[in-house]
């Protein structure tokens, strides 16, 4: 097959590309330029779109003897990821920009251009697996065999079309072995640290970034009874489950710590309460993605609402008429926020299968 290897400049994508070459595919490496000013992305920030990352990706492709290109997706990245991130916080949500980047840029936009140029698939270094059903057809997305690095959650927001054109060559290997393989091939990125920061906020100061783009929008912090506790500069400063940085002088009546339990973006009201007030027993999600035939009607499954977060058993009711699902949690979860992705899994001894996902739009508490 003729495949595009998405080269982030890290060790995982390097080994994924190498394995695709070894498998006999016609491979072309491509690095996505996502920053409109890559000079501002510090090399020490562990982002994924710095100039150094691009140089690392080029060196890997040179060693593999495959063509290398840089595609500028910075305008689309700003619109679909950065602007979406800002507007989500304005709406009182807690978005994950890496999920949006996967959904809109690293797969949808990349595939759109790749298919137009005659490529059959995209190869990435994500830790996930695709297995073919016994009756043929498109593969099912499964967890990686490395539970510490599994990225099936962040891929659960993809559509069936994207999954059908994906290859994840490193999903059947644990990370230490990937580094060993990279070192054996002489890749300079073999010991390169993993990236964790939001690439467009390289200093990690999300509040300062949002403050520059949203500005002051004063509102009140209130307790669960509606008593006003203090004024704040903007509800975007807060996320569900937040404890630190509230700076409330008046202690709670029971003396226990307070947590952000609700954000009303329309009024700018931030509600705080006890840890017990955080426990969610059910959620509603919209913008559904269907990745498996079992993602229909009512069924029992498991749900994950954060990358590397807890996985709990649940009862799912999919309403395809309005593209929503209700998920009743068998074990309450804390810190569940609107804007997060709820990814549904079917437990399986060979690796849990991703059935689909949705964006959380409402929660119900104990």
UniProtKB/Swiss-Prot annotation:
Q: Where in the cell is it found?
A: Cytoplasm
The UniProt site entry described as Interaction with tRNA is assigned to: 126, 340
What Enzyme Commission number(s) appear in the record? 2.8.1.13
Q: Where is this region: Interaction with tRNA?
A: 149-151
Q: Where is the active site?
A: 101, 199
- Write down the SUPFAM superfamilies for this protein, in alphabetical order: Adenine nucleotide alpha hydrolases-like (SSF52402)
Reaction catalysis annotation:
S-sulfanyl-L-cysteinyl-[protein] + uridine(34) in tRNA + AH2 + ATP = 2-thiouridine(34) in tRNA + L-cysteinyl-[protein] + A + AMP + diphosphate + H(+)
Give me the residues that bind ATP, please.
6-13, 32, 125
Disulfide pairings: 101-199
**Pfam families in the record, alphabetically?**
tRNA_Me_trans (PF03054), tRNA_Me_trans_C (PF20258), tRNA_Me_trans_M (PF20259)
Q: What does this protein do?
A: Catalyzes the 2-thiolation of uridine at the wobble position (U34) of tRNA, leading to the formation of s(2)U34.
Similarity remark:
Belongs to the MnmA/TRMU family.
In Swiss-Prot or TrEMBL terms, this protein is called: tRNA-specific 2-thiouridylase MnmA
The organism's lineage is: Bacteria, Bacillati, Actinomycetota, Actinomycetes, Mycobacteriales
Gene (name only): mnmA
């Amino acid at each position: 097959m003729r495949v595009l290897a998405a080269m982030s400049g890290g060790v995982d994508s390097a080994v994924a590309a190498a394995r695709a070459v070894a498998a006999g595919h016609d491979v072309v490496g491509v690095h996505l330029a996502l920053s409109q000013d890559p000079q501002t992305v510090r090399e020490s920030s562990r982002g994924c779109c710095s100039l150094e990352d691009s140089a690392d990706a080029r060196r890997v492709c040179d060693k593999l003897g495959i063509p290398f290109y840089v595609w500028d997706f910075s305008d689309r990245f700003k619109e679909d990821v950065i602007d979406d991130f800002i507007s989500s916080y304005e709406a009182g949500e807690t978005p994950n920009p890496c999920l949006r980047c996967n959904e809109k840029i690293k797969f949808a936009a990349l595939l759109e251009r790749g298919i137009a140029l005659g490529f059959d698939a995209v190869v990435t270094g994500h830790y996930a697996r695709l297995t073919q059903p016994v009756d043929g057809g498109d593969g099912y997305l499964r967890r990686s065999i490395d539970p510490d690095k599994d990225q099936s959650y962040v891929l659960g927001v993809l559509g069936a079309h994207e999954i059908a054109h994906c290859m994840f060559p490193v999903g059947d290997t644990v990370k230490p072995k990937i580094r060993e393989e990279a070192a054996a091939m002489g890749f300079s990125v073999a010991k390169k640290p993993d990236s964790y920061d939001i690439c467009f906020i390289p200093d990690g100061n999300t509040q300062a970034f949002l403050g520059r783009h949203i500005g002051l929008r004063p509102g009140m912090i209130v307790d669960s009874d509606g008593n006003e506790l203090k004024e704040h500069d903007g509800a975007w400063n807060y996320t569900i489950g937040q404890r630190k940085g509230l700076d409330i002088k008046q202690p709670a009546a029971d003396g226990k710590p307070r947590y952000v339990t609700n954000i009303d973006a329309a009024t700018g009201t931030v509600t705080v309460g006890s840890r017990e007030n955080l426990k969610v027993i059910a959620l509603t999600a919209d913008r559904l993605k269907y990745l498996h035939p079992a993602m229909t009607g009512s069924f029992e499954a498991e749900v994950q609402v954060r990358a590397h977060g807890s996985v709990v058993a649940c009862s799912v009711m999919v309403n395809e008429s309005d593209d929503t699902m209700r998920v009743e949690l068998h074990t309450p979860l804390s810190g569940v926020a609107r804007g997060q992705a709820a990814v549904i899994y079917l437990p399986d001894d060979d690796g849990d299968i991703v059935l689909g996902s949705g964006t959380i739009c409402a929660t119900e508490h104990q």
